């Protein structure tokens, strides 16, 4: 098939990159599959997940990934005594109003994609294939193979230059050939994984749902929209009688790719790199693409382990297209593969603090918008959410509790080995140990009466009961000893805790002191208040500071309403119902403003609760 960006000639190059970097794994995702050549090539080595937002592409991938070799159609041959290709080619068809191709893509509709004779055969065969499948004469794998063979055969008699953006105004010799359905060419393998799956989704949506070892990304490089280039094949595959428009008969309802849009492509990549849940990422791109290559590599570094990105080059030819705006103007096309290991770790904060979100962070992040310049963690706490978020410019940590703020400021700004050494010195000096009440109380007295430093409080918090941070009205720390100690787990968390954004801003104060108008519209403000309808350590005794009640809740909702009116984006973690209690304030506010409610899941061990995330934006257009 003549297909824009077909990677058949680059299969060895992809294999070489995998071998060079010793990329290991069992699952291979081909996320922009096109004609399925990459998945077909690797199906003997991996479980393959294939995806394309064009349905006809899914059909072709199914034909190749559900079959280890060309199907033998045993049931069909047993019934008809011949192959379905022989049977279909021998069939005679009579025009009728239901034959969509015949009535819309031929001179009958003043279009010259196909001759009337060939269109008649294509319609008849398409409907016969459907009927054979519905009657159980052919299996799903056989159905996909037959339909893919039909689509491939259509391209052999199409009166076009290779795509369906336009048709010739004269009949090219190939278009006058009599239509014959021929078996689709595919690679034979000893077997194919029963777990191979083919999707027909927007890739950026899909990566929020799947995971694996190796992801191969081959997005559109130019402004050419595939939905316009292959609309005839799409309609034959779907056979859904769509509404058409214009001289070329394109589908009215169709999805455009953001990767082919100059103003959106960079943000599509940002979102894809942020959300992809695969260990190894390979991206095919070129020096003639919408997003400049150096910008794409720099973007990949932000999401790569240790910021390491490899760029492998390969000379390649330019494919001819009717769009001149993205052609190389005589420059030799250089195809590259960008390779990096995705940083998939969620680094848990070294500070144990009530309400921390480390167990639901991945689910929260799936709901982020595609473009995030700044991430404001407005009620930062242990900084689990903000520190793990890759915003392109910076992350802002804001916390109203001065002692929590001072500890997190110390953790963020102190080298890991120094912080570990400082804690160990205090542990040794006071002979701290599990349930060591006397030693713990000595350190607590020293902190309350002599040296109220962040490092002393942090060490106390490690050994305290359930790591509760509690103070009396005199601001004296009064949590008792617990069954905890400074162990290798803590040291590992300190070592691994690194903020992802290029810059971190630390702010002490209430969320209400944040002037959201100082931030651009691609800033995301995240709020994680205490929950009215649950029991939490930070509501117990008010921690010696302001507590959280209905008045506080109403103030927060008012602030969020103002933020929304200013055109800013927010995420709000909360709980609507728990143990028979309902947060009516929150529920009415959400319904009144029409905000989105996303279920995050169960959190909490002692007091399990079903958490939600409220957002005032849509990640994907509706």
From Swiss-Prot:
It comes from the Bacteria. This is Modification methylase LlaI. Belongs to the N(4)/N(6)-methyltransferase family. It catalyses: a 2'-deoxyadenosine in DNA + S-adenosyl-L-methionine = an N(6)-methyl-2'-deoxyadenosine in DNA + S-adenosyl-L-homocysteine + H(+). It comes from Lactococcus lactis subsp. lactis. Disulfide bonds: none annotated. InterPro entries: Ade-mod_methylase_MStsI, Ade_MeTrfase_dom_2, DNA_methylase_N6_adenine_CS, MeTrfase_D12, SAM-dependent_MTases_sf. Its EC number is 2.1.1.72. One of its GO terms (biological process) is DNA restriction-modification system. An alpha subtype methylase that modifies unknown specific adenine residues, and protects the DNA from cleavage by the LlaI endonuclease. Keywords: DNA-binding, Methyltransferase, Plasmid, Repeat, Restriction system, S-adenosyl-L-methionine, Transferase. NCBIfam families: dam. GO terms for molecular function: S-adenosyl-L-methionine binding; sequence-specific DNA binding; site-specific DNA-methyltransferase (adenine-specific) activity. The gene is llaIM.
